Amino acid sequence: MLHVTRGVWGSIVRVWPLLPSFLGHSRALSSLEAKMGEYRKMWNPTEPRDWAQQYRERHIPFSKEQLLRLLIQEFHSTPAEKAALEEFTAHVDFCTLFHYHHVLTQLQALYDPINPDRETLDQPSLTDPQRLSNEKEVLQALEPLLAQANFSPLTEDTLAYALVVHHPQDEVQVTINLDQYIYMHFWALGQRVGKMPRKSSVGSKRFFFKSPPAERRYFKRVILAARTKKGHLVLKSFKDTPLEGLEQLLPELKVRTSTLQRAILNVTLIVSGVVFFVNVGMVVLSDLKMATSLLLLLFAAFMGLRAAKMFGHRRSAQALELAHMLYYRSTSNNAELLSALVLRAQDEHTKETLLAHSFLARRPGGAKGPPEETSQWLQSEVENWLLAQSGCDVAFNGKRALAHLQALPPTVGMYPPPGLPKLDLLATLSSPKSAPSDDNSLEKPLGPAQPSHLVGN
């Protein structure tokens, strides 16, 4: 359960005004606390209200190689059809490569001035308005990329649920001050309900009687974009994150001891204190003729030190548990996240194009006909097929997949071209000992020119 504290300047979370279209409605603390209050009044909620409408899974739960094998088995079983599909896949990879490389280059150029992990020489520091403006551009550029990567944004109601509900098997609880944040936003994909993949964790065997892992709702990937008033834009990606544990991913948090754990520690202190006072205190009082008030004062000081030590040790163990969890769940940060996100968007782009190509090939008339009717047919067919193959209810974007397919250049050739140098050949060309005498031979392009059509928008 999240413990929320208020700042001295009021109870409003000021959402960055430069991002109205990106962050949606203003996330005021009053609105968020109202929804949190509603969840506190519920008896043991297990998921956000209207969860099926709030979150729709859009991620295709197969890798490109797995999808190719499934499509070949069902739709391209003959050797000629298999070869044609593999050739088409190479064509899609080649065309999308240029587009997403261009997208990554633009993102890196936008992010470089505000990159907190830059290893190059320091540049002149930016003013706060300049930094906010750069962050706005980066986040606006990430919005369509996240959509193409099939991440789904988590709503404010979902965030309120995650901040209130604490799963009994989560030993670590945290405290944050919402007034310290300018904005925070979460995206997720790969919703699962089941036993989470569990790494060895500190303190997981502290008790003899420990309930087995329960089935939980978690996400295979979660992306966080948050900024504190005294910090910078934080971009992080995590794996295998439970819905009730989103608050543990935020920066500027403090570990706290739960009410149950505090009660257990207090009872332990009281029982041990009474035993100590009866067995030791009474002997000291009778043998040393010490005043009762002085003995009680010394006893209170001793118990205070013991309580501080016990609670401090407990918080240290929980902080170590939290650090251990974040170490194993973190997948990429900041600039590295941009590269990983572009690769994921390119992969989802390719898979959507392959599905559109394979399904429209078996439709009478193919892609001919009204685009709206074609995209609806494609969406329905692919969603039913994915449900049958994976058991996952995926919301497939038929309109976007059809646009990807139609944006491809018509020519399908051999990719990479036969004349494209290999890495070992490049090393040979760069060696002065093996350099050819004809300098003009080095001026030949190492690859084909960029296609005139950029795939996707």
Swiss-Prot record:
Q: Where in the cell is it found?
A: Membrane
Coiled coil spans = none
- InterPro entries in UniProt: DUF3754 (IPR022227)
Region annotation (Disordered) ranges: 429-457
Please list the residues that carry the modification Phosphoserine: S316
Provide the alphabetized UniProt keywords.
Membrane, Phosphoprotein, Transmembrane, Transmembrane helix
Q: Which domain of life is it from?
A: Eukaryota
Identify this protein by name. Transmembrane protein 143
Source organism = Bos taurus (Bovine)
